Every structure is written in structure tokens, then in C-alpha cells.
Amino acid sequence: MPSIVSLTAALTFVGAVIASPVEKRSAFSVEQVPHTTYLKNGPAQKVKTLRKYGKPVPQSLLDAAESRDAVGETFTASAVGDGSDPAVPSDQYDSSYLSPVTVGSTTVELDFDTGSADLWVFSSLQASSQLSGHQYYQADASKLKSGYSWKISYGDGSGASGKVYADKVVVGGVTATSQAVEAATSVSAQFSRDSNTDGLLGLAFSSINTVSPEPQKTFFDTVKPQLAEPLFAVNLKYHAAGTYDFGYIDKSKYTGPITYVNVDDSQGFWGISATAYGVGGTTTQRAISGILDTGTTLVYTDTAIVKAYYAKVSGAKLDNIQGGYVFPCSATLPNFSITVGGVAQVVPGKHINYSPVDSSGTTCFGGIQTNDGLGMSIFGDIFLKSKYVVHEAAPDSPPRIGLAQSASV
């Protein structure tokens, strides 16, 4: 017969399991998965970024995106852009990075996106015509959050929407047993055509989650109380799969010190401030406000900064037909940096060559473009691929970003 002590301990254990949405305290790493099925389309990336942040898209940019000589990627004006868990480039030029996630009983490949706060997936609720080439969540009616819905919409009326479920989500070594899963009932053409990506896992702040009538917690916020440390770190790489580290900092992945700064989370993003920028060996003092966003491919910043950069690139020009700054692919590109927390965060020049704009590989599209229409700077994968970036959100202190030079650079 069990003792009162052992029975009490057992009941306490059961109560803890019921009360907690995750199974155990943990620290883990998730590796990305690469795809090499299409060439990058620089103008289309700009279109997707503008739409992601709810900004109007100039017709000239749409025209440039449509006329891009891409292999395996057709862009139309109606399209919508957008652990250590491994992150894999979704094309041969590192256009995006995907990571395996088990949602319910299905493993899908999701875009880990620090610029949004929704965990949404393709699902069995969609028409079969939208599911071709995708892995998708098998919706379980018993786990439906009745009365809840979600919708991501863009200026042209396109987007994605659906129902909300409370289900198991496994990322790397941790399981959230009651995570809000936004199951799509309908998605627009660009999402359904992109068979590389089965949805998004948002890692911005839960305040901008789109679920109605009540925003839901991100995966990070759900598992954070159970992590060894209340943080995740991003280690994207140049022409290679990167990782997401949850609950710990991997000292083997960076060199030098980590520079920490407080985050401006007033808009729900991982916002930072810089005091200067550098082009080659020249540093210019200038206040820059921006966000770090793994769901955006390029860097978008103030026009004066972009002009100053390409002024140092032989043959560079603003090409409206291509939708941005281009240069001879053979050009030597200077390093670029922003000063954050008193430390210059350097992006190697070779990272700023985004992709060719023609089949001959003569002219290339720049990885740094103007932020016209965005109202802020966005430091996407072009910036992040040379960094180890710590995202810390302790319950008793302001959120912080930590930046260090990646050991893989």
C-alpha cells in the first residue's frame, strides 16, 4: 500500500503536469534545412517585405518583380510575400531558412520569423488544391479552441486565415503540449505555390499575435518558463544551414564578447538603436532605429545610408527596372556596419551580393536597399548571417538583444 508521502508526491507531480503546458525544463538547438530549387528574386523580396508590414507597393516594383528572370520562381502581382533548430536555406542563395517542427502528429518545415508572432501552418482544413507539395497539420476537432480565429491580411486583400487549436508542438528537444496552433483554412496563391515552406513560427512578442478575440502566446513564450535560461539565440550562416538555440548560449558559435542592449518592444518587434554606420573604413555618426527580423531576407535602411554605401561600389546604380540598387557581379563590395551599444557590428562585403538579376550573372542585386515606405530600418538575414544574436526576455527585466560576431564568418 503506498505511503501518504509517496501518494502526496505522486499527486503533486500529476498536478504539475496538468498545470504546465510544457513537459520539462530544457535547453536545445534546432538546425535549419536547406532547399535549392529556385533563384532569388530581389524585387519580389522587397514586395514581400512591404506587404508583410502593411505598406503600399509601388507599381514599378511590382513590374520589376514580375519581369525578374528567375529560374523556378514565377512572381505575380497578386502574390503575397511573406532549439538549436537547424535552419536550411530555401534556395541556393540563402533566400530563407527553414526548420523542422512537429505539430500534432506531422513534421512540417517552418520559417522561424522574429518579425511576426503567429504559429500558423498548412492544414487538413484547406482545399486539396492548396496542399500540393506541402506537409500539413491534421486538425483534431477535440483540440479546437471554439470561437477563436486568425487572419493575416495584406494591402491587396491577399493573405491567410483559419481556425485555432491547442495542440502539441515539438521543436528540437522541447514539447509544448498545449500550444496555440493557427491552422489555415485558406491561403493566397504565393503561400500555396511555395512548396518549400509549410507555415511560420513567429518569435516576435506575443502582443502582436493576430488571434481573435484574444492574442495567443508565441511558442517561445509558452516554453520560456521551462527553459534553462529565458532566451533563444539565432546563428544563421552564409551559404550554409544555421541554428536556433533555445534556453542557452553556445559559446562555440561566436567570437569575442556579446554586446547587450535593451530592446524597444513597443511595436511588438525586437527593436534596436544604432548610433553610427560604417562603409569600408569610414564611420559616420547617425541615429538609426530598426528591428532584427529573421523573416526578412535583405537589409532595408535610410536612403542616405544606402547611397553612401553604393557610392563606394564601382558601377553600382539605382535601377528602377530591377527595383533597387544593382552592381556588376564582379565588383568588390566594402564591409558594412552599424554601431550598437558602442560596438561596430560588421557585415562582410561578400554577404551583400544578394543574387544575379540576369541569366548571364553579369549584374547583381544588392542585399542593402532603401527603406522607402517602411518607416524603419529592418535588419534581415543579410545582416544576421554574420552574427550570433541572443534574444533575451527575462520576466523581471527589460528584454535585451545580444550581438556577437559569428564564429563561422
UniProtKB/Swiss-Prot annotation:
It is an enzyme of class 3 (hydrolase). One of its GO terms (biological process) is proteolysis. Glycans are attached at N335. GO terms for cellular component: extracellular region. GO terms for molecular function: aspartic-type endopeptidase activity. Transmembrane segments: none annotated. Its main location: secreted. The active site is at D113, D293. Its EC number is 3.4.23.-. It is found in: Secreted. Disulfide bonds join C329-C364. Pfam families: Asp. Coiled coil: none annotated. Keywords: Aspartyl protease, Disulfide bond, Glycoprotein, Hydrolase, Protease, Secreted, Signal, Zymogen. Residues 20-65 form a propeptide. PROSITE patterns: ASP_PROTEASE (PS00141), PEPTIDASE_A1 (PS51767). Residues 97-404 form the Peptidase A1 domain. Secreted aspartic endopeptidase that allows assimilation of proteinaceous substrates. The scissile peptide bond is attacked by a nucleophilic water molecule activated by two aspartic residues in the active site. Shows a broad primary substrate specificity. Favors hydrophobic residues at the P1 and P1' positions. Belongs to the peptidase A1 family. Monomer. This is Aspartic protease pepA. It comes from Leptosphaeria maculans (strain JN3 / isolate v23.1.3 / race Av1-4-5-6-7-8) (Blackleg fungus). The lineage of its organism: Eukaryota, Fungi, Dikarya, Ascomycota, Pezizomycotina.
